[in-house]
């Protein structure tokens, strides 16, 4: 825990609204200001969300996020350890309010919000086409490639389509391609993630113990009524490496082992008391 001091955060805001599937070429970087946030991330196909407040942004930076759709990357961490991405998302709502001598900028983010709302798929595949190709093509077209997807697609290479025509929204198309194969999907930091059953995302495994930021004791939650699975709930100092789908190694008196993260809520304030990650993981 010795290195988990000196909290720090950084925002990167795109100078323009990128096209669906396009890349950002110019960023406005914000450092050294007070930032507070609540970020909610899950394995569900609904977009992950964040509420962010930034204090005393310059007039130029405020002007840069007046329009919906600008891309925002929120990073947080510790001075001795470095920064990790807490969320990357599209701005769906922004406001600037002057309170006394301070300007407070508030905005709401949705991870993959624009592509899920406006992205469309229209193509056809012949019988025998690997599912991995169809999913990879869609991800590439819509700018969702990257992350852990390259490691996850090979497991779909042996599965083939009977012949399919895709024409509709992104979520509808992914459901059509993946659900029959027993796979689920979500968007994490602007990248498509696909998982089979209770498999994990193959990312590095964060260690959660009293020496690495665990707060209090983990709790065992009542099994989900629909799936009959127990959940382990725990709270730690902010750790942005804890992402839905990854494994965490928990070490405590009551529970020890590796658990797959189902959801995480990161709360932080560089000048306040909040700086935690609240996690639910399956046993």
Where are these regions (language model features)?
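Assembly/oligomerization scaffold segments
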Residues: 1-108
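An acidic/polar, Gly/Ser/Thr-rich interaction patch typically located in mid-to-C-terminal regions
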Residues: 37-61, 65, 197-283
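Amphipathic, non-transmembrane alpha-helical segments in extracytoplasmic/periplasmic proteins
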Residues: 50-55, 109, 122-147, 164-188, ...
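Short beta-strands and strand-coil junctions in structured, solvent-facing domains, enriched
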Residues: 59-62, 80-81, 115, 145, ...
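Extended Gly/Ser/Thr-rich low-complexity repeat segments
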Residues: 63-71, 117-125, 245-251
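Short beta-strand-centered interaction patches in the first periplasmic/extracellular domains
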Residues: 93, 102-116, 148-223
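A generic structural motif
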Residues: 95, 113, 265-267
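Short solvent-exposed strand/turn elements
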Residues: 103-120, 273-283
């Amino acid at each position: 825990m010795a290195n988990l001091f000196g909290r720090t955060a950084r925002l990167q805001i795109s100078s323009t609204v990128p096209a669906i599937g396009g890349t950002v070429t110019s960023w406005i970087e914000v450092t050294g200001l007070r930032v507070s946030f609540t970020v909610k991330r899950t394995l569900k196909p609904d977009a992950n969300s964040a509420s962010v407040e930034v204090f005393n942004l310059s007039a130029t930076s405020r002007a840069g996020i007046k329009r919906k759709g600008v891309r925002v990357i929120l990073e947080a961490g510790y001075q001795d350890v470095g920064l990790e991405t807490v969320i990357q998302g599209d701005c769906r709502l922004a406001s600037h309010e002057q309170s006394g001598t301070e300007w407070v900028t508030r905005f709401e983010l949705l991870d993959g919000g624009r592509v899920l709302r406006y992205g469309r798929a229209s193509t056809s595949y012949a019988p025998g086409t690997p599912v991995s190709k169809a999913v990879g093509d869609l991800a590439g077209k819509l700018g969702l490639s990257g992350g852990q997807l390259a490691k996850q697609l090979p497991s779909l290479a042996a599965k083939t389509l009977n012949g399919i025509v895709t024409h509709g929204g992104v979520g509808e198309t992914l459901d059509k391609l993946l659900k029959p194969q027993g796979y689920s999907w979500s968007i994490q930091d602007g990248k498509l993630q696909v998982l089979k059953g209770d498999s994990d995302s193959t990312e590095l495994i964060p260690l959660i113990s009293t020496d690495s930021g665990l707060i209090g004791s983990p709790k065992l939650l009542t099994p989900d009524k629909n799936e009959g699975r127990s959940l382990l709930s725990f709270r730690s100092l902010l750790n942005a490496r804890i992402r839905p789908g990854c494994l965490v190694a928990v070490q405590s008196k009551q529970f020890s082992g590796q658990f797959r993260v189902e959801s995480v809520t990161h709360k932080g304030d560089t000048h306040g008391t909040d700086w935690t990650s609240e996690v639910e993981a399956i046993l």
